[in-house]
Structures are given as structure tokens and as C-alpha cells.
From Swiss-Prot:
It comes from the Bacteria. Keywords: Cytoplasm, Ribosome biogenesis. Belongs to the RimP family. Its main location: cytoplasm. The keyword Cytoplasm applies. GO terms for biological process: ribosomal small subunit assembly; translation. It is found in: Cytoplasm. This is Ribosome maturation factor RimP.
Length: 152
């Protein structure tokens, strides 16, 4: 069974692409009585506040009609930012050579949190170099991953 995020991606990807943007990823966060649907978009020339408003209007209309989330929630549309989350294997491939912070669902080598350079991607296996040692992580075991911005 597909996750809520996957069902929402399937529902929203084509309309976002039709507006000229890439649907970078989706997060649905429940925190007490408040839930937030975060839709991350990216564009060839970046993303402006006006772009986010345009996509938010379209996504909001689709969500109102399709009603895939029964509870109340806030809709946020934004660019992924410098510390962009990584949702897809292809996004890891795009950032080979960059540093990433990765949190796993289940421990690998007695660890759930890794911070290292994305060395390689083969199939759904991600190789991170952490302190000079390679750790191979299954994409399906990754709970959350973000690029670590380099300001140096």
C-alpha cells in the first residue's frame, strides 16, 4: 500500500509540472492538533514567492476537490532551499559529491544517523563516505535525508 506522501505525489505531480515546475517532494507532518502538508517545488531558474503562491492556489483547489486528507491541515508550498530534503534516488544521484545528513528507519552498523559525502548511487543503494569509511545504505531504509549546505 502506498504511503500518503506517495499518493499525494501521484495526485499533484502532473499539475505542478504543467505549471512549469518540478515536484521536488512532499511531507505530511502531524504535530498534536496541527498537521502540515509541505509541497516542495523547484524550477530551472529557482522559485519565487509568486511561483509558490501560484502552485499553492492550484494544489489547494485539487486538494479541495479530491479530498485525500480528511483532517484539517495547513498547506505550505516552498522551494527545497539550500538544505534541501532528498526524496528520490535520482535526487541522491544529482548530488553525488555533496555532503548529506541521513536518518534511517532501522539501524545499519548500529547507527541510525549518518553525515557524510554522497559517494555513489547504484540501484536503490546509496554509498555515503563518513569519516573516510564507506557506508552503503538502502534507499528504502532512509527515513529522512537533507543536503548539508557548504558555506566555505
Amino acid at each position: 500500500m502506498a504511503t500518503l506522501e506517495q499518493r499525494l505525489t501521484d495526485l499533484l505531480e502532473a499539475p505542478v509540472v504543467a505549471l512549469g515546475f518540478e515536484l521536488w517532494g512532499i511531507e505530511f507532518i502531524r504535530a498534536g492538533n496541527h498537521s502540515t502538508l509541505r509541497v516542495f517545488i523547484d524550477g530551472e531558474n529557482g522559485v519565487t514567492v509568486e511561483n509558490c503562491a501560484e502552485v499553492s492556489h492550484q494544489v489547494g483547489a485539487i486538494m479541495d476537490v479530491e479530498d485525500p486528507i480528511t483532517e484539517e491541515y495547513f498547506l505550505e508550498v516552498s522551494s527545497p532551499g539550500l538544505d534541501r530534503p532528498l526524496f528520490k534516488v535520482a535526487q541522491f544521484e544529482k548530488y553525488v559529491g555533496q555532503e548529506a545528513a541521513v536518518q534511517l528507519r532501522m539501524a545499519t552498523n548500529n547507527r541510525r544517523k549518518f553525515k557524510g559525502v554522497i559517494k555513489a548511487v547504484q540501484g536503490d543503494m546509496i554509498t555515503l563516505t563518513v569519516d573516510g569509511k564507506d557506508d552503503v545504505l538502502a534507499f528504502t531504509n532512509i527515513q529522512k535525508a537533507n543536503i548539508v549546505p557548504n558555506f566555505g
